[in-house]
């Protein structure tokens, strides 16, 4: 079990990242790379090589496309690739609203819930019946500390977070209660 400090300062990078990394095939790592590529301020296409194809990663690609990102997966290549085509972004999340279905993908639910909180609009996430039993309250509570974010669970403390944002996020200190 990890022990984290009560406060963790996250500083913006001084310059854009220009690197190549080889990572093990993993749906969780592929989904993290997809979110990072979608949010990256890039002025060229971004290609993820060796992405793991799974239900979770296909769900994430479809959700990002629904959010307005120009993504083209090629799952049949010798090394599967996912290309993000450059598009001038006027918004962090291109779509002002979206209904996202994450099937049974817990990583997609959590990553997308946090990701859409950076956008300006209204986003609703749903999944299969089993997803509605999985807890997400800790994440919703953390997101509700952000100025302008309203993250709610439509049923119990389960899934269905509807996230509404009306203005840009402001810098500040946000905390997570110890477990």
Residue ranges and their predicted role:
Residues 1-179:
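Structural preference for solvent-exposed beta-strand-turn elements
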């Amino acid at each position: 079990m990890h022990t984290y400090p009560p406060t963790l300062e996250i500083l913006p990078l001084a310059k854009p990242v220009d690197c190549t990394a080889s990572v093990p095939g993993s749906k969780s790592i592929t989904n993290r790379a997809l979110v990072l590529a979608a949010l990256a301020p890039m002025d060229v296409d971004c290609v993820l090589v060796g992405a793991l194809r799974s239900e979770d990663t296909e769900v994430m690609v479809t959700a990002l496309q629904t959010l307005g990102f120009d993504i083209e997966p090629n799952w049949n290549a010798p090394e599967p690739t996912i290309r993000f085509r450059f598009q001038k972004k006027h918004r962090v999340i291109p779509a002002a609203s979206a209904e996202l279905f994450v099937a049974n993908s817990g990583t997609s639910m959590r990553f997308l819930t946090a990701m859409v909180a950076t956008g300006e609009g209204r986003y609703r996430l749903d999944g299969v019946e089993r997803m509605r039993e999985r807890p997400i309250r800790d994440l919703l509570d953390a997101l509700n500390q952000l100025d302008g974010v309203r993250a709610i669970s439509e049923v119990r403390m389960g899934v269905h977070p509807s996230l509404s944002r009306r203005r840009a996020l402001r810098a500040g200190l946000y905390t997570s209660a110890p477990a």
